[in-house]
């Protein structure tokens, strides 16, 4: 009874390793499939929420642009 328990434990550990690493990026795979089909409803449009921030002035935006131009 010990051998099947050990084998199941090893199998679970070996299945957990690729899902926790950055090499197995399930989010990137899903994004690639979504971009392949090009459906607008499935694309991430959250970045539009940050385009109009009333607390930022033109001077602030210019300063941010200067800081981030090398990225």
Curated annotation (Swiss-Prot):
Expressed by the venom gland. The modification Phenylalanine amide is found at residue 37. Keywords: Amidation, Antimicrobial, Antiviral protein, Secreted, Signal. Residues 1-23 form the signal peptide. It is found in: Secreted. One of its GO terms (biological process) is regulation of defense response to virus. GO terms for cellular component: extracellular region. Residues 41-71 form a propeptide. Antimicrobial peptide. Shows a low ability to inhibit hepatitis C virus (HCV) infection in Huh7.5.1 cells. Belongs to the non-disulfide-bridged peptide (NDBP) superfamily. Short antimicrobial peptide (group 4) family. This is Peptide Ctri10261. It comes from Chaerilus tricostatus.
């Amino acid at each position: 009874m010990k051998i099947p328990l050990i084998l199941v434990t090893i199998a679970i550990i070996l299945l957990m390793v690729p899902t926790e690493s950055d090499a197995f990026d399930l989010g990137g795979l899903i994004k690639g499939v979504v971009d392949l089909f090009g459906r607008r409803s499935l694309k991430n449009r959250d970045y539009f929420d940050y385009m109009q921030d009333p607390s930022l002035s033109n001077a602030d935006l210019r300063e941010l642009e200067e800081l981030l131009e090398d990225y």
